[in-house]
């Protein structure tokens, strides 16, 4: 809490740092057409954005005016809303002069459905502040088809009657959509009904327990409506957004990337974390726009990029290749090209191994893992009961087949990913098997009733969650048994933060960290494998990784930790770039 207070105090002083400036005004940003600010993490960035919103609310209050906010949903703005709620409760920030207009809503969609944006906004913001209910405007997913056109026109009209949006908060989808303005949206579009892109529906599939359950349409504010806002701030977190952020910021204005229309707005700031900024020219290839200090990691990044850009292998790069693409200083310091190429070839070659636990009786000078001890104790942490085999199945297989003591720790039950119809199938099978046992049949009937009578705004009952968790558990055991891991080495941690029954999870607590610490203490591993996916910084993978890091911090003074190496794997969401890889199996 103390460190968070210090963070907020510091950001408070620096809140103007996200204020708009002309894009490309600094030489290293010359390819950028939208001003953007990069923060080290999404929490810091979110607090900064929340403070700008709070300052605007207070300014309007002092002037005796209403503050008109356009609000977004999804994972990106959650921490912004958390900070606004905190400021309301702890600092007395009032929302009585605030009128809000949300960007979008699935169609059709009941307000009380737990997947609705009406539910989302009340869960994360409106239920916790003093805003007048009549000042909350969210597109209505229950409007009849016959009334939709008039309803959408009136939504825009109401915004105009309020004086327009003072501030519009946006996220960005992988298709480049803002709101639900999918590729092909016209810059003059107003609020309307649209058909969702397949990628957008795929991204929402987990929340809806399968893509077939995701609505095919949505109501969204149009591009024209958004561009009329006085101030626009777009949030983007995680590596999954890096590619589309670069297209929006540095590419041409095109209907195929609707967020690129924000280049036309004179008061827009993109607020990014480091992962989301990774494909911007000044971040991805800084040597093209500024003079850089060449260290070993930057050399590797640059040479791998040059190979990919030119379609050449490392050993075929020439002096002219380096000179033409901003690396003349590197050539002068570490060249000629022949020497650079050989050094980089050797660096990458030494990451490749068939022995992830170390090769016995072999010189390990240039190998990624130690020779000793020959038989290592290993913990593979898997956020869900499948990430181990999806992301590092080959490495998993090698570790077992080469004789190491492999433990697998499934951090969460993964019950949220099991669909109702899948759970119902298992429950009905159990009922047929146990039909002579009245006690068991009564429990199974309760489960079946809970599933078949569940309303759209209800979370699963505890019994249903337990059934779904058991389905995932036994799927995992089938995989670990196939690999030859004894059942006693398979650990189902069921971290408490995950067990809410809904999309929104609890923050990491001491109980979560202690469970992980206890397992590490028990096994005393020589190797730990953990999911290093940062595609969604608020997702379960990142939360599980944070819990592991917290546990390791508490245990680092232990003697056995001196012999413990931590390897981060990827694969469920994205892969490591070649220059980042330290062990390729």
Which role fits each region the language model picked out?
Residues 80-87, 178-190, 538-554:
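Short Gly/Thr/Asp-enriched flexible loops that form oxyanion-binding sites at enzyme active sites
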Residues 1-13, 40, 44, 58, ...:
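Conserved phosphate- and dinucleotide-binding cores of soluble alpha/beta proteins
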Residues 68, 99, 166-167, 231, ...:
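Structural motif
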Residues 1-35, 277, 285, 294-351:
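Long, low-complexity, Lys/Arg-enriched
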Residues 1-68, 363-365, 372:
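N-terminal glycine-/serine-/threonine-rich phosphate-binding loop
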Residues 59-90:
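Glycine-rich N-terminal segment of FAD-binding domains in flavoprotein oxidoreductases
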Residues 95-99, 103, 378-385, 389-465:
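ATP-dependent adenylation/pyrophosphate-handling site
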Residues 201-209, 214-218, 311, 316-379, ...:
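Metal-dependent de-N-acetylase/amidase catalytic core
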């Amino acid at each position: 809490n103390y460190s968070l207070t210090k963070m907020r105090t510091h950001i408070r002083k620096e809140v103007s740092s996200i204020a708009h400036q002309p894009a490309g005004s600094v030489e290293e940003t010359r390819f950028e057409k939208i001003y953007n600010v990069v923060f080290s993490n999404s929490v810091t960035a979110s607090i900064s954005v929340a403070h700008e919103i709070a300052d605007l609310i207070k300014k309007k209050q002092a002037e005796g005016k209403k503050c008109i906010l356009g609000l977004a949903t999804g994972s990106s703005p959650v921490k912004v809303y958390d900070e606004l709620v905190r400021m309301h409760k702890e600092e007395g920030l009032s929302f009585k002069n605030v009128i809000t207009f949300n960007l979008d809503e699935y169609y059709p969609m009941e307000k009380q459905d737990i997947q609705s944006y009406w539910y989302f906004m009340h869960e994360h913001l409106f239920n916790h502040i003093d805003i007048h209910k009549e000042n909350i405007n969210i597109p209505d997913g229950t409007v009849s088809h016959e009334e939709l056109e008039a309803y959408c026109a009136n939504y825009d009209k109401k915004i105009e009657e309020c004086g327009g949006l003072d501030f519009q908060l946006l996220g960005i989808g992988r298709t480049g959509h803002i709101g639900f303005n999918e590729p092909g949206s016209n810059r003059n579009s107003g609020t309307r009904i649209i058909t969702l892109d397949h990628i957008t529906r795929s991204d929402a599939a987990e929340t809806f327990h399968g893509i077939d359950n995701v609505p095919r349409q949505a109501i969204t504010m149009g591009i024209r409506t958004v561009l009329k806002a006085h101030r626009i701030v777009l949030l983007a977190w995680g590596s999954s957004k890096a590619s589309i952020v670069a297209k929006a910021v540095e590419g041409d204005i095109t209907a195929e990337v609707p967020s690129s229309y924000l280049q036309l707005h004179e008061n827009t700031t993109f607020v990014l974390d480091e992962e989301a900024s990774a494909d911007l020219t000044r971040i991805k290839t800084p040597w093209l726009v500024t003079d850089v200090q060449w260290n070993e990691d930057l050399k590797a990044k640059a040479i791998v990029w040059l190979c990919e850009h030119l379609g050449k292998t490392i050993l075929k790069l020439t002096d002219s290749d380096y000179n033409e693409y901003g690396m003349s200083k590197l050539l002068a310091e570490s060249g000629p090209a022949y020497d650079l190429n050989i050094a980089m070839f050797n660096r990458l070659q030494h990451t490749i191994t068939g022995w992830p636990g170390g090769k016995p009786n072999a010189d390990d000078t240039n190998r990624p893992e130690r020779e000793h001890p020959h038989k290592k104790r290993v913990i593979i942490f898997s956020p869900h009961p499948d990430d181990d085999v999806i992301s590092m199945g080959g490495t998993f297989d090698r570790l077992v087949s080469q004789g190491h003591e492999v433990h697998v720790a499934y951090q969460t039950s993964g019950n949220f990913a099991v669909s109702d119809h899948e759970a119902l199938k298992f429950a009905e099978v159990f009922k047929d098997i146990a039909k002579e046992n009245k006690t068991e049949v009564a429990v199974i009937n309760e489960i079946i009733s809970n599933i078949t009578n569940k309303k759209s705004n209800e979370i699963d009952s505890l019994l249903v969650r337990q059934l779904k968790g058991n389905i995932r558990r036994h799927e995992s055991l089938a995989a670990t048994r196939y690999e030859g891991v004894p059942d006693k080495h398979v650990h189902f941690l069921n971290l408490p933060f995950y067990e809410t029954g809904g999309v929104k999870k609890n923050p990491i607590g001491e109980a979560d960290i202690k469970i992980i610490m206890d397992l590490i203490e028990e096994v005393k591993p020589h190797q730990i494998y953990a999911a290093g996916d940062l595609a969604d910084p608020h997702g379960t993978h990142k939360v599980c990784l944070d819990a592991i890091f917290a546990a390791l911090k508490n245990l680092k003074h232990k003697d056995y930790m001196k012999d413990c190496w931590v390897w981060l794997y990827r694969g469920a969401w994205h892969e490591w770039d070649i220059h980042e890889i330290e062990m390729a199996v």
